[in-house]
């Protein structure tokens, strides 16, 4: 296998990803804005995403166990339904019980779907193409978010909130249809060979990439929830719509940089080589957002900030995911996917909730300034980890060891002979 696109069953997986993240991203800025327009508080607006992400994260903790018990097909199908259909429940109103209940149900579906989709990519693709495959995952997700994030607010202006809720529900159900085209994958086995039983706590192996990702995504929670509202202070007429456009631009940059990081990983042979520089870029982007709002600069300056943050955000995502696959044993693929998603969604949820509460006491500019500082904390953790050394990998039956086993024959024989290393 020489092309990611030829991997069996990968195209339906990509389609399901596009639909799932499209349904999520379409409502990500819409629901908090709807709460505010209905007279709700900033705290409730932030909690709509916070509760969604809380139930997402809790579900992600148990998803590896579900995959072992019932397999990928069942988990993917049920989770796609739970993400899609309940979106129509927002038609019941923006009261706290109604909106938080719907958000919780959809969070369960989103949590299981994201873990299963990430893990199944590692099952379908040979390890020598894993960096590129995870980069393509970023492109699929980025395309969905680039279209859906600005489309949500734009559609609200034209057809109203209720119609957008129905559209989101329909897109989520399309993910259910796409899941039916994914080939059966044997559930991950609970037992592994004796060589896997190296008693190194899992948290030691994944803590640094998880923290790096989580600190970056706290800013993502703030940006997706409050950037449109903050831009209304710069331009009352078009600020919210332009805010949605900036979210799309941010995800376009994220999509490209995530694929770039994947290609670098395949070329170098190990992940993490570009993590630090892109953490710096993401922190700079959020700091620029704070500066634009503080100085009351023209609204189009926000495009620069969105590009900077998106570029850093995308590469950090891919570096964190491949670092987890690289460090954990092969039998822990679903756990690696779960931890990555927990860090991503947990950071987003904590960011939206914390910064929503923070906005009750400070303005948008200092809020984004604090978000930039939180990213710097993740940068410090990564720098300390690199300074302390790289001896945190279980070098038995994990991606690092398997890559070494295929890279030596590739260097020795560059002819057309078939080489081992696929899955």
Residue locations for each model-derived region?
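C-terminal transmembrane helical hairpin of 12-TM major facilitator-type secondary transporters
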Residues: 272-320
């Amino acid at each position: 296998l020489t092309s990611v696109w030829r991997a069996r069953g990968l195209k339906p997986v990509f389609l399901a990803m596009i639909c799932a993240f499209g349904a999520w991203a379409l409502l990500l800025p819409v629901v908090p804005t709807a709460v505010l327009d209905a007279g709700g508080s900033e705290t409730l607006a932030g909690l709509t995403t916070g509760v969604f992400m809380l139930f997402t994260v809790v579900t992600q903790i148990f998803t590896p166990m579900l995959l072992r018990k019932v397999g990928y097909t069942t988990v993917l199908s049920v989770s796609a339904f739970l993400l899609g259909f309940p979106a129509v429940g927002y038609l019941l109103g923006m009261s706290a019980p109604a909106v938080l209940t719907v958000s919780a149900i959809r969070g369960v579906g989103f949590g299981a779907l994201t873990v299963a989709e990430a893990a199944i990519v590692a099952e379908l693709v040979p390890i020598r193409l894993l960096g590129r495959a995870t980069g393509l995952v970023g492109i699929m997700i980025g395309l969905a978010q680039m279209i859906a994030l600005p489309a949500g607010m734009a559609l609200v202006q034209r057809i109203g909130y209720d119609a957008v809720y129905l559209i989101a529900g329909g897109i989520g159900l399309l993910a259910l249809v796409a899941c039916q085209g994914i080939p059966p994958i044997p559930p991950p086995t609970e037992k592994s060979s004796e060589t896997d039983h190296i008693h190194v706590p899992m948290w030691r192996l994944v803590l640094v990439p998880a923290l790096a990702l989580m600190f970056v995504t706290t800013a993502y929670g703030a940006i997706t929830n409050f950037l449109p509202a903050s831009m209304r202070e710069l331009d009352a007429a078009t600020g919210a719509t332009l805010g949605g456009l900036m979210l799309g631009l941010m995800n376009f940059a994220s999509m490209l940089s995530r694929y770039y990081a994947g290609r670098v990983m395949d070329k170098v042979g190990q992940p993490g080589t570009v993590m630090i520089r892109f953490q710096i870029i993401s922190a700079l982007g959020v700091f620029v957002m704070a500066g634009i709002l503080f100085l009351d600069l023209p609204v189009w300056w926000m495009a620069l900030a969105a590009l900077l943050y998106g570029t850093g955000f995308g590469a950090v995502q891919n570096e964190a995911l491949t670092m987890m696959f690289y460090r954990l044993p092969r039998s822990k693929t679903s756990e690696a996917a779960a931890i990555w998603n927990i860090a991503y969604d947990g950071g987003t949820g904590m960011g939206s909730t914390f910064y929503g509460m923070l906005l009750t006491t400070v303005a948008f500019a200092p809020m984004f300034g604090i978000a930039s500082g939180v990213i710097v904390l993740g940068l410090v953790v990564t720098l300390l980890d690199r300074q302390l050394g790289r001896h945190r990998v279980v070098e038995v039956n994990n991606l690092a060891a398997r890559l070494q086993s295929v890279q030596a024959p590739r260097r020795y024989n560059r002819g057309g002979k078939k080489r081992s290393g696929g899955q």
